[in-house]
Amino acid sequence: MEVSGPEDDPFLSQLHQVQCPVCQQMMPAAHINSHLDRCLLLHPAGHAEPAAGSHRAGERAKGPSPPGAKRRRLSESSALKQPATPTAAESSEGEGEEGDDGGETESRESYDAPPTPSGARLIPDFPVARSSSPGRKGSGKRPAAAAAAGSASPRSWDEAEAQEEEEAVGDGDGDGDADADGEDDPGHWDADAAEAATAFGASGGGRPHPRALAAEEIRQMLQGKPLADTMRPDTLQDYFGQSKAVGQDTLLRSLLETNEIPSLILWGPPGCGKTTLAHIIASNSKKHSIRFVTLSATNAKTNDVRDVIKQAQNEKSFFKRKTILFIDEIHRFNKSQQDTFLPHVECGTITLIGATTENPSFQVNAALLSRCRVIVLEKLPVEAMVTILMRAINSLGIHVLDSSRPTDPLSHSSNSSSEPAMFIEDKAVDTLAYLSDGDARAGLNGLQLAVLARLSSRKMFCKKSGQSYSPSRVLITENDVKEGLQRSHILYDRAGEEHYNCISALHKSMRGSDQNASLYWLARMLEGGEDPLYVARRLVRFASEDIGLADPSALTQAVAAYQGCHFIGMPECEVLLAQCVVYFARAPKSIEVYSAYNNVKACLRNHQGPLPPVPLHLRNAPTRLMKDLGYGKGYKYNPMYSEPVDQEYLPEELRGVDFFKQRRC
Ligand SMILES: Nc1ncnc2c1ncn2[C@@H]1O[C@H](COP(=O)(O)OP(=O)(O)OP(=O)(O)O)[C@@H](O)[C@H]1O
């Protein structure tokens, strides 16, 4: 069976929903990252809602609920509530719901905390890593938002309210007391953070130290723009982890360095750097007076493309200027829209750079594809993710705490105003890098959310406990970053490719009778938020295609599993699927029927000329005329014979063909 075709079930496509951790809005999992980019712009830090995750943290003995612990239950109402999603690849998840099964939680926990290999720290010797100079990037360049924050900009809501609180409470308790009361904190002020704050020398009842401003500064930097955008590199020097595509000795790199840009299709999973590479090409081409025009296939119309082409023609003929046209998500253009570029790419009016998360062999016109070089970008490796995160952490002036040196925090207990106000555990950086699953945008968004949520929860705690608001010496722990990530849409590709890869791996593992691998691929899909009914439908197919008559009850099992999933939904139905998958992996296999049927189909498709008529004796003869024409004549009614009947059932010209013996006609 081929499992690479799109899964198009509009009903199910409405179910694959996740919740935005900032605005709490439900949406298709595929949209969460782009939504977060917008949402972070719209919602100031004080409005982020870390409490949702934190509440769960309080309710569950095992600590904060990992994002991936979101459970789904299929229900009609959930389906009705959700808007339809545009593509099937983005479909198929139900409403998030907390699972309460202990065993299940345990397995998720182990997923959430991937071990660092042999306990080694991954944080590299980044040029500016662990420096304590707030607000500066590795390059020494300060992000615009930081610069603005440093100036006499209007004060934010949080800042003003914090000041008010301070005035109301007076010169009250400091952070030291906060530690003691940590258990009352509805937010994130958990034991480890309190401990660390004490270790930093944050105890004592003094007023907030001027260092608090640095935390404010960080918050303002993050409020203005998604961190992923702020950190988007302009040069290949800051572009990490894609050495196969643009490493030192690659053809593409030399072409970029000599500014000979061919038409390109950049293919890779979300957040791996497709747009960023185009951005780097753009920065480079501007230096060489090449026009760089960007369109997104999600909203551009064919006319927009025509306009760009027309202008490119003018620029070429009047000013001898080249135009590079970057089309994000090019797979969203249909075939005829893609045809619009074809002659213009061919004659060099435009250099096309398309970015796609989908396999271009299926999604991009063959003719267009043959005129472009396909660059395959991969999920960013963990080391590259750490480097990217460290670049951001340094630009925010956040200090990384070395967990192998427990005295480290103490060394920051002086009152120097140049000290960093915010700290992050090194293992938190590692965890973020792991859980981001090669998606730099997800990692940077996760970092941004963790920082904002930490600042915001600290503020909430101060408000509740009547203490003065002092965002100085805030510690970001591993748990904070886990909450900053929505694991369900990170471990499992929301754009489609991984969806088909995983179901294909499951199918092949069952076919190969590998029950371990079968269970692994099943869990990987379900834990990633796959729709259980999608998996169940595939099992129904497998039952006939691969097991067939070797064990006809497999089909009954699969249909029962499908119905069971339909009745009880996730998380309860996962064990039904697991049982079925293991049954199938262990079952004897037979493709006899499947291949014989394929032989019949091939026979029909390859037939030249009109198909042979149905033999007269096999035809029904409900009227006299038909009887007169010979319909049904000579037909031997089998029940009337005690012996096997010698009778031909195939058309005359197929006599002797045996589809079960691989004979094709
Ligand atoms: N290789 C990389 N090196 C450094 N930073 C990166 C890299 N890849 C991505 N990033 C960071 O992640 C952010 C998102 O990356 P980008 O927009 O390029 O992803 P994409 O592959 O185009 O994703 P999508 O398919 O979802 O549009 C960038 O703004 C940048 O900050």
From Swiss-Prot:
Sumoylated with SUMO1 and SUMO2/3. Its main location: nucleus. It holds the Pfam family AAA_assoc_2. It is found in: Nucleus; Cytoplasm. GO terms for molecular function: ATP binding; ATP hydrolysis activity; DNA binding; enzyme activator activity; identical protein binding; single-stranded DNA helicase activity; zinc ion binding. Belongs to the AAA ATPase family. RarA/MGS1/WRNIP1 subfamily. This is ATPase WRNIP1. It comes from Homo sapiens. The lineage of its organism: Eukaryota, Metazoa, Chordata, Craniata, Vertebrata. The gene is WRNIP1.
